[in-house]
Amino acid sequence: MFYLKKLLRQLLAPLCKHGSYTHLQLFVMGEACVPGKCVLTMFLTNKKFLNKEVTEKFYNEFFAIWLRCRPETRLITKRLFNKMVMTKGLFVLLAYLYFVYRQCKVLELLSLYKLKTIKWVDVETRFRVYPPYKLNKLLEMPSFSEINELHMFLFEQQLLLPIPTHVNLPCMRLFCLRDYEQTETVMLRYRQREHVLSFPSMLRKYALKSPAGNFMFTMAKALVENFCFSADRYLIPVEHNNLVPMVPSKPERGDFPKILTFALATSLKDGLATSVISLPVMCYCKTKCSRFILEESYICVICAKCGHCLNSGKEKLCSPQGFSLSSMFYFRDKQEKNLIYSMHTDVMYCSLCGSQQLVFERIYEMSEHCVLGMKVKTVSWKAVIGTNSACTILNDNVKFDVIVPCSCRSCYSTVHLYNVTVKKLLRLVSHGSDFQCQRCQHSFRETCLDLEDCVNICQGCQISQNVRCI
């Protein structure tokens, strides 16, 4: 079965016409940079089984490679699958095995959610003893049930199609770093005596049976996480131009300290796990009049640990990585809640992850700062997306929904925009765009610039009047 990996590299690898780390991105984000350039995109489908059009396209390319292959390759194929003639069923099986092979390569670096870590050698060993009559049935008529039965035999779990990204915290799959929670060796200082020398061996012997794990490492993780949450700036000692925690490029120098690995993962999580995105302001003519502002306007409650917006209401924001937030937890009153309020401790919790680290963030805010003795006013616009993984919307082909402030200068309500791409989102706050709520479409409210006898013009109207549009 050593020839199986060689066969997959010769026949399937030429169908992957892309750059480095594309397979890693495919398993982490569930999206391909350039559609149609990787054979694994066959498994990116919302249907029950593979997409027929994509499968037919790659099968035609694969068949051209098969016609040019050497006789030794065809002999290996006959020996492994007892098939001399190439069929579409055999191509689907080879594509699935290549999918499993690439999954095993990715799992050597990362521990991905709901994907069981298994070595490729073990996969080959299990595939060798797969019943021949089931394999022949799969080759004659490939279907999801047949492929799923083979997947259950190899991994002892269901096959998830498309490539599984249905998780509560999508981008945290990247930060489930491989084996960083393993128990460290206990360092002890002791005298060279016989009864003392047996003490470390006794600790190691009974530590394997203890369900508590490494309590010192757990406390250190809590300290690091709380510090990264409370501090605005901090330094993590990582070697120059070396991503050892994620890609161990220098194994001869030993393992990277696991607590630093966790610190790096926490730092990246705080920067990427969010459902609020800052928008570039290309035009200040939409700066809102301060006469209509309310204290509770445009405040969204964000869980600092999982990054979800917890007060989006009944709005269902569609996104490729999203899931229904309002249907996660039900209480005795059968009402949908995203926040849990404890009457005993007088503390609020996130109903999705149970964290107490809740922050309040405004999606529209006008602030004033003092820089080198000069007063500088800034206007910030933000959008709320339906997933907590901000990196998933960076693909131009992905469409998603957002909640943004109303573009009317006298309104402090929100608008739900459908099927937005990242390019449209970046050009949203510009002179030519208009996104008003239903209330503004049927009513007119005067701002400071509309009043003839207005003496004191608010800051928002001053900015809208004096700043030149781009």
UniProtKB/Swiss-Prot annotation:
* Gene (UniProt): U33
Protein name, as recorded: Protein U33
Provide the GO biological process annotations. viral process
Q: Species lineage, top-down?
A: Viruses, Duplodnaviria, Heunggongvirae, Peploviricota, Herviviricetes
Q: Which family does it belong to?
A: Belongs to the herpesviridae UL49 family.
Name any one Pfam family assigned in the record. Answer: Herpes_UL49_1
Source organism of this protein record: Human herpesvirus 6A (strain Uganda-1102) (HHV-6 variant A)
InterPro entries the record matches: UL49 (IPR004339)
A GO CC term attached to the entry = viral tegument
